[in-house]
Amino acid sequence: MIIKNAKVFTEDGSFMQGDVVVKDGRFDSVLERTADTDAAADSTQQEIIDASGLIMIPGLVDIHFHGCKGADMCDGTAEALDVITAYEASVGVTSVCPATMTIQRDELLSVMKNAGDYNYHGGAHLVGINMEGPFISPSKKGAQAAENIMQCDYDYFCELQDAAHGLIKLVDIAPEEPGAIEFIDKVRGSVVVSIAHTAADYDTAVEAIEHGASHATHLYNAMPPLHHRNPGVIGAVRDSEKCHAELICDGVHIHPSVIRATFAMFGAKRMILISDSMRATGLEDGEYTLGGQAVTVRGPLATLHDGTIAGSATNLMDCMRFTVRQAGIPLEEAIMCATANPAKEIGIYDEAGSISAGKRADFVLLNDDLDIVSVYIDGKEISC
């Protein structure tokens, strides 16, 4: 298959008018548009996709979301994962690393086993698990269930990782809690350690980073705000070039001005767009659940009964659009933050995150308004 005359988002983070050849479900070559490529395409018997006037981007990679279309990662069933992977694919998210919640020990073990045993049926590729809780701070629990929060337990984590067949890619830690630094020492190098749901001050966050933490979960949310005398986690993460930070750009969690300021402070290469979506995403307003707690959804806003924000009701493609349209971030940077950056962060960049020879042919064709025209996974068009 040849995708002809597309505005291709290339691995170097720029656009090129070109043709992309797909063979056996993988990108074979990316060619700048010339008369020679026209002749080569015309001489083959391959399927030709005319992408004139369209933008071709890699399939998006969401490394932090909980569910969609009525299903949640913590439902712990293959059917829920089928719903999640199908919906995410339909909105251009072709690789997913869904997040768990702070649920009961045995229940979390069952959720991990379900994901580890999951058989792919098409749709978005399940490429990892984001373990959001239970090793967090009760004072910054957000929408997590307080009764299930616990101190870091390395043996329990190993049990969960074994059940998931090594699929846990990120683990969230509140570094000020007892045993957290020792836990980081034990797991660093085998999983991405993310500072999350934390009341840590600057020095404690710096210590965690020095011991191996390299990621910040939904920056600004469930952590102390940036203060000019107490920079906290945000300041510590900003000061470490090895750290990457998630942003929920759904129009609820972070003001567009702060999105712009964060990109200016960190640089686009350190930003990762996430959706943090919950099961109401893709459905009507109403009453739902997240981590066993009741959630009310009205438009893009999802809240617990006390008003606490409880994830989002927005998919990653819409978050990327918001980043461009409302926050004014260049399209090239927004795409990178929703594709290459998250893929690199969880170690799947050899398979996903860019349109490059040898990688899975997961891509999205968009029009100039950033509306989805078509989605391809493993070189095959899927129903949107």
Features from the language model and the residues they span:
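Histidine-rich, glycine-flanked metal-binding segment
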Residues: 1-2, 8-57
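Conserved, mostly hydrophobic/aromatic
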Residues: 53, 131, 187, 216, ...
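Divalent metal-dependent hydrolysis catalytic cores, especially in the metallo-beta-lactamase
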Residues: 66, 82-111, 124-137, 164-176, ...
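Active-site core of metal-dependent hydrolases
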Residues: 162-283
